Amino acid sequence: MAPTAKTNKGDTKTAAAKPAEKKAAPAAAAAKGKVEKPKAEAAKPAAAAAKNVKKASEAAKDVKAAAAAAKPAAAKPAAAKPAAASKDAGKKAPAAAAPKKDAKAAAAPAPAKAAPAKKAASTPAAAPPAKKAAPAKAAAPAAAAPAPAAAAPAVAKPAPKPKAKAAPAPSKVVKKNVLRGKGQKKKKVSLRFTIDCTNIAEDSIMDVADFEKYIKARLKVNGKVNNLGNNVTFERSKLKLIVSSDVHFSKAYLKYLTKKYLKKNSLRDWIRVVANEKDSYELRYFRISSNDDEDDDAE
């Protein structure tokens, strides 16, 4: 009976190992399926990290944290294997209960192994984004470099040099053109005209005082009548009228006024105004008597 019992114990060990392997196989397959899915999922963050260069630093930090967590998780399954072997050696007596416990113990390390496999798979999948992020970062400064290079010439424009002031030219003394009649002293005018009324006044045909009054009333100075002031003065010496003036007026103007006076008194037909000198006039009769003598001689 003893040998048969030994053979039964060996069969129980092999029988217990087979269900454990069968259970471990689907667990490993499930672990592989789970590992492959994270790889596919990890590829998406890799593409997102390549597009968003700014998030590369955060992805690198996550990778480091995952690697640090994977190391203690891998150490735990390694310690769990010897513990499971010692339990199998100590539990040889109960044949029916041992296979169930061994199957559970074998199934427990299988998920534990799958967990590090997932983490290990996530670390290499996440690592490429970090590598891709590095060239992306390098490309970003390279792209940004031309902008400062282009801006550099604008900043480095040379300041305009102050133009040297030209030496002041020697100032020329310019003589102002003085217009004629401005700023010059006017020469004093002194006019003296005489009108000789001796021949007419002796015959009591004409009054010299009345003639003087008429000339004063009609004579214009600066275009105005009764504007003589101290500029024009009148004198009578015997039967002559003397007109003195500091204002310029023509000799003919005085002759014009004398003729008007003779015409007013109806003396213009017998008396005429004759210039005997440069500045004087004389009143004379027309030669009527000479014509009468000629008529008498003809008879």
Swiss-Prot record:
Residues 1-142, 155-178 are annotated as: Disordered. InterPro entries: Ribosomal_eL22 (IPR002671), Ribosomal_eL22_sf (IPR038526). The keyword Manganese does not apply. One of its GO terms (molecular function) is RNA binding. One of its GO terms (cellular component) is cytosolic ribosome. Signal peptide: none annotated. Keywords: Ribonucleoprotein, Ribosomal protein. Residues 65-98, 105-142 have a biased composition (Low complexity). It comes from the Eukaryota. Residues 33-42, 55-64 have a biased composition (Basic and acidic residues). It holds the Pfam family Ribosomal_L22e. GO terms for biological process: cytoplasmic translation. PANTHER family: 60S RIBOSOMAL PROTEIN L22 (PTHR10064), FI24544P1-RELATED (PTHR10064:SF0). Belongs to the eukaryotic ribosomal protein eL22 family. This is Large ribosomal subunit protein eL22. It comes from Drosophila melanogaster (Fruit fly). The gene is RpL22.
